[in-house]
């Protein structure tokens, strides 16, 4: 049976979707059967894996609100399976207010296919609202990308408080699996200081492999492919391959 991970940080621009796309694809390259659930209305993980809007007949929105079986919405790609998102998801938080088990609709859907995958990632939106709450209730563990920049730790206390609340009241199995340091520039004292500070706050939980600031990482999404397929020799590709190996060993 596979393991469900929510990739979450309520701050935008921290490399959350970049990590979701490239870590999922790198684990797929290592032979794991992966499913990436794009639960962000911006749908950047969907487009980042080459799935165009016109190709999407059913999305995660249809699964959680229209009763579409999750298998009917999954798209098979060369980089692993994807449960695509769409802009319709932006209104889902309001529509879920009157739903039964509203915090668990995503979990209920994903449980139908959980045994078919080694790893399922949920790319949560950059907020701590209903969609992210669904991601946290569905997951067994969370992965938190943290950028090595000013205010990196800002807001993480809110995220960890939410994690504790969900664990206490809704999902007792939920754990912090690991923290991924992103946008790291080893040439600067500042990046190194931030990395040290994050490791101090999360002892034993920060992955040894860090993700550098890298032009190829920024360019790959516009081509609809993971960085390993865009430029396999880039520092970004090497970093995500090494992170995937570390991640797999920790499973």
Regions found by a protein language model. Name each.
Residues 1-251:
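P-loop NTP-binding core
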């Amino acid at each position: 049976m596979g393991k469900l991970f929510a990739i979450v940080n309520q701050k935008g621009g921290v490399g959350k979707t970049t990590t979701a796309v490239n870590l999922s694809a790198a684990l797929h390259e290592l032979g794991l059967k992966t499913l990436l659930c794009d639960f962000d209305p911006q749908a950047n993980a969907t487009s980042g894996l080459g799935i165009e809007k016109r190709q999407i007949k059913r999305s995660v929105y249809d699964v959680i609100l229209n009763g579409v079986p999750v298998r009917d919405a999954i798209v098979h790609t060369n980089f692993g399976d994807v449960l695509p998102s769409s802009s319709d998801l932006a209104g889902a938080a309001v529509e879920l207010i009157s739903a039964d088990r509203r915090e668990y609709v995503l979990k209920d859907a994903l449980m139908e296919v959980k045994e078919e995958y080694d790893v399922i990632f949920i790319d949560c939106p950059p907020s701590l609202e209903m969609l992210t709450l669904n991601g946290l209730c569905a997951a067994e563990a969370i992965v938190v990308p943290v950028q090595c920049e000013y205010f990196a730790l800002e807001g993480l206390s809110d995220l960890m408080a939410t994690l504790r609340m969900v664990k206490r009241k809704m999902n007792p199995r939920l754990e912090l699996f690991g923290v991924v340091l992103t946008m790291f520039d080893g040439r600067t004292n500042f990046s190194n200081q931030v990395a040290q500070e994050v490791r101090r706050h999360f002892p034993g939980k920060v992955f040894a492999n860090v993700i550098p600031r890298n032009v190829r990482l920024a360019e790959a999404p516009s081509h609809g492919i993971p960085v390993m397929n865009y430029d396999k020799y880039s520092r970004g590709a090497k970093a995500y391959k090494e992170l995937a190996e570390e991640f797999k060993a920790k499973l």
